[in-house]
Structures are given as structure tokens and as C-alpha cells.
């Protein structure tokens, strides 16, 4: 830009400054013209500052005052680049030197006051700007030295904001069509945005009055479109008078879209109107047709005017029908308007019933006054005493707010009543929710009780476990084996297969080998002993030498459908020994006697139902049994564990064992535990030694409770 200016330009600018700062009256248009020249960067800002500084040092006070006014005008309209030159040390130190000059060469008092006024106003407007900080330094230094400034005026910082031509940017390609610059394709800068473009994209010229440029200057196509749209207020189609060698997609995308959208919308609208007119003209029977339209229609080539006569005959009827329909439409419109007016009137009449609360509610203005008063009071707490007396606005606010006390008190009372109502409603809602939860719990408990009664659970407060089979509550017999770990009844995995030996338990009756298959079976069914899952194998634990007589292939697990309470699991201490076929048979059917004949299967199932009437306290001798006898496996009906709580009947005298086999009393207490811990799902434990797993036996059938026969006494059981 420096190539634009020369000595001729500076001399012309100096002449303009001399004419503007002559001793005559102030020429405001000339001052604005000079500021536009500075803002348009026609003259360098440093040269303009030097010219003004030279003119301020004139001996004539009128010239000095006019120069100071011109400087203020240029500061407010010359742009940021000129303000930085005014805020430089060269210009500000010149002003301070004139203020501090001796009385012989000191300027007039009016000139001094004008300088102080301008310095104060410039410093106020330059607060917060780092590049103009030297003005504030000069202002504070003059205050410390005791110079009396005029009353301070609040001047916004936007006073120094003025539009100026932007700084020029550089690029290797056109910033519009992206064409590379070459020796023939030269760079051109847009005076509006400062970007660089090729000659094809920056061929427009337009004056820029908002930047102080009154003569037409080069701008690019995008800025030209923006400025012309802004000036005319309507979209202008883009002229194509200049040939553009490189037309690219980017260049086309920069074109304004508003003109294209408007043209397409107008074309669509015109086409729609034409189609509607064609449809209206084509339907001759839809309404009255004028004679001009009938004459303009071409006559059909066939049949002459054979179809025209009936149309002319039907025209009066059609006209009458159309008139009747129009009359009906008018009546409907009138009815609609009347009903609509009535509705609006009723709504407007009902509207005042909603607004009685406005009498005591605070208006936004009153609320704002209250907030303002509170803010002022908070600020006055940090002020010296007596400040409140010098502020009449605070007194006026206090008087106006004092009148609002009754309204504020009433509003506060209404708010408190609403708060109490809200608390009451919340309490009611919480009580209702609590009652509802209680009702749900009662329904759930009743549902669980019904389910327990269906499966034969005697305890109404016991909640059934999430298992497939119902639990059996029975009095556990005394004299059972201790737990291996705790000495108590086993609580984990109560359905594992009992092993051959026990730690701390009672020994075998005579430590004899098991009986041969020729001996008699026990006559009690296994379902009568739910509290002792495996009486035959658990009570007779002969040495390992006795187990060698039996077959090693019959180590089996219990039937999957038998469910036993968790207290009757017998952990093994010694490695499991082999069990004979008779043992496995008695494992399912039980053998409590030594010499009794086996009871038929049907008698077992019947006598099982008759056991509640014959329940007696258990004794330790009932767990000492003879070796089992070979017995075929029975159907799963004999193994049904879903009966109610059963207890072992008193054994006959044949079951009496020697006294050395009686267990100590703590073992009897271990078996007499609450029945609530017996509701655990059956989970068969795997055998430690190889044998038959759960898959070797039938799966658990979903058996219903068989009907119990009341007061059925099995005579052979009583005799024995």
C-alpha cells in the first residue's frame, strides 16, 4: 500500500488539515472527510499523526483548538490503526510537554482545558485495551501531579470502534476459484475483505463508504454481491459480462442461492396456476361457462355441435343449483361466525375470573425495584457513612417499596398457605403409598400361603423356597451322626449319598457282615423316615473288611426325586466302600428290623399315610439296623417325598441294640432342630468314589399328593 502514496498525497492532506484548522469556524464536513481519508488508509496513519502534532504546536490558540477537535474526530472515526498512533509516546508526550511548558510559551487556558478533556475522554474509552494503555498512564500521571480535569463523563469503549479496511492477506492461489497465480495470472486484493483473488474473480469495482472509501475500488465477486444486496435490499442476478477462464465447482457454489430459489419457486407457482386454469377450463359441466369461453373453444371435428345443445339446455338448471349451494354456504358461514363470536365473547367474559390474584401479586416492575433496592443497600454497606443521604434515588426507592409492604405480606401469606397445602398433600400421598405397599405385601403373603398349603406346608409364616419340590418338615430322630466339620447336623448338600464310616459316630451293633439276601426285609417304607435319609447305610458301618463281601459295582446315589432336610447329610471320613445290591435296595425302601418279613409295596404306600396317627418319640435304637436284604427296586411311587411332616415310629423290640451303641445326648439334640431349615432344594452331591450318578436312576416325577387315608392302622406294624 505504500506505493500508492507519495509526497503529493501528503501535501494534499496537509492542505486539507490547514483548511480544517484555520482560525475560522469549524468545518465539520471537512473534518469527516479527513477522517475518512485516514480510515481508508489513503494516507499512512503515522503521517497523519505527525501532521496533526505539527498543527497543534501552532501559536494561534484558535488553530490549536480546531486541531484538537479535528484530532478527536479522527480518533472516533479513523479506525484502530490511527488510534494506535495517537496512543503512542510521540503524540502523548507532545501533549504533556505543552501542558508543562513554562508560562512564557505555555498555551492558552482554554487549550489546556481542551487537552485535559480529550486525554480524560480517550483514557476512559481506552480502558481494558492493552494496545492503548499509554493513554491511561499519562492520565494517571497528570492526576498525581495535580492537574484539574473537568467532570468525568461516562464514555463507552465502542466510541473508538470504527470500520477500517482490513489488512491484506497473501496466498499462492485464488481464494475463490483456487487457481494458482502465475506470471500472467496476477494477484489482486479485495479492498473490502483484504483477501487475494485472481483477475477474473475480482473484476468488480464499487465504492466502500462504510470504510471511508468514496471512489470505486476493486472488490471480489462475493463482496460485490453482498454489498449490492445490502444497498438495494433485494437479490440481484449475477452479471456475466466478464469472461472467466476457470469456472470451477467452488466458484459456482459461491453464487447467491436466493435468486435461484426465488426463480424456481416462481416457475413452480406459475405452472401450478396454469394447470389449475386448464383444469377449470376443461371441466365444462362443473359450473357456469361464459359465452366467451364457449366461443373460444374449438369445435370438435366429429358430430358437429350435437353435444352443445344439451349443455345449453342444462345451463339454467346448473346455474340454479350453484346459486342454491352458494346460498347454503353463505348461511353456514354466518352460523360459524356467530358461534365463533359467541365463543370468543364467552372466553373473554370468563377471562377476568382467573385474574383476581393480581391484586396482591407483585408486578415485574415492583419485583425489580425490590431487587434493585436490596442491591443498593448491599453496596452502601461498604461505602463511607452519609452516602445514603446524598442519593435521592435510594430514598425514592425506599418510599415506593414501603408502600408494597402490605402486598408483600399478603403474597408471603398466600405462599405459606400454598406451602402448607403442599405438605398436607404430600403427607396424604405418602400414607396412601404406604397403605398400598402394605396391601401388596398382604396379597403376596396370602399368595405364598396358598402355594404352601397346596404343597402341604404346615407353617403359615414360612415362605416357600424357590425349588421344584415341596419341603418335608419332620422331627429328626436322635442319635444321628455328627457333622464332620462342626459337630452339628450338616447344613450343606443334604442329599449326598451316605458313606460307610463316620467320625465320632456310634459303631456297628455287632460289627458283623451284612446279611445274605435270604434274610427278611424291613417292613417300613422309606417315606416314613424323611428325617433320616439313609437309615440302612448310615447306622451300620462295619469295617472295610466286611464291605469286601458285597459287590463293588452297586455304589449308587439316591433317587433324584427324594428330598430330605438339610440336617441329615452324612459326610464321609473314610473312603467309600462298595455296597451290595441289598444295601442299594434298602437305600430306597429302608430296613429297620432284622428278622421281619418284607411288606408288599402297596402296603408300604398305604401304611405311609397312616403314620401321623402312630407317631412316637424317636429313640437312638431305631438307627441300628440289620444288614439289608436283596430286594428288587420298586416303582418311584414308593419314593415319593412330598408328604407332610412324618416321624419315625417306635421300633419293635427286635430292633433293640446293645447299650454300647447308644449315641450321646448331644447327638439327639442335633437332630431336633427347627423345620424351617429343611426347605432346601434337592441338589445331589457327586460321589467321591466311582459309581452310579444321578443319571442312572429315573428322573423326579411331578407327583401330586396322594390322598391320605385317615385312621388306617396296619395291624402287622402294631403287632411287631
Curated annotation (Swiss-Prot):
Residues 506-518, 699-711 have a biased composition (Polar residues). Residues 650-667 have a biased composition (Pro residues). Residues 290-301, 519-555, 562-577, 594-614, 668-689 have a biased composition (Low complexity). A zinc finger (FYVE-type) spans 168-228. It is a peripheral membrane protein. The FYVE domain is involved in the binding to phosphatidylinositol 3-phosphate (PtdIns(3)P) which is required for the association to endosomal membranes. One of its GO terms (molecular function) is zinc ion binding. This is Vacuolar protein sorting-associated protein 27. Belongs to the VPS27 family. Residues 264-283, 313-332 form the UIM domain. Component of the ESCRT-0 complex which is the sorting receptor for ubiquitinated cargo proteins at the multivesicular body (MVB) and recruits ESCRT-I to the MVB outer membrane. It is found in: Endosome membrane.
